[in-house]
Amino acid sequence: MRSKYLKYLNEDIKFDKETMIGIFCLLVVITGMFGFIYEFIFYYFNGGMKTFYWRGGNFLPWINIYATGSIMIYLLTYKDRKKPLKVFLVSVITTGILEYFSGLGMDKIAGKRCWDYSQEILGALNINGYVCLRSVLVFGVFSLLLIYIVLPLIFYIAKKSNKKVFVTTSIIL
């Protein structure tokens, strides 16, 4: 297993367009659901959530911004995967920008404030309540998990699976 992991780090793994579509679809599902679970757990323990409410505004258990962020992180850091510090720093900056402009856009365009970090843990270091130090550091760690655990696993599944089955299943999910 270690040799396969080192191969992931050291070699550019090439997939055809159809398989890449399947990889991106699976990545969107996994990271969007992960974001939903993370936010549920965080807000349950942080705010003592008394009743369950559906975060993310979807009819399925995922949050779009996590899925969008994962695609951006993949596109911006995959070639630098041998440099974890660079992956982390690029991820922190990228997710901070994504979160800031997503929050600002929803606030200004839709008139809806979906999050406000001004009162959160480590919220003192925030930008207009849309982004805070805690959130971007957590997203940086999640990005490391994405690049070094989730993507190698998805690539492994894509390589070992029948292409048609993998792509179809990924798209259906």
Residue ranges and their predicted role:
Residues M1-L173:
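Aromatic-rich, lipid-facing transmembrane alpha helices and their immediate juxtamembrane interface loops
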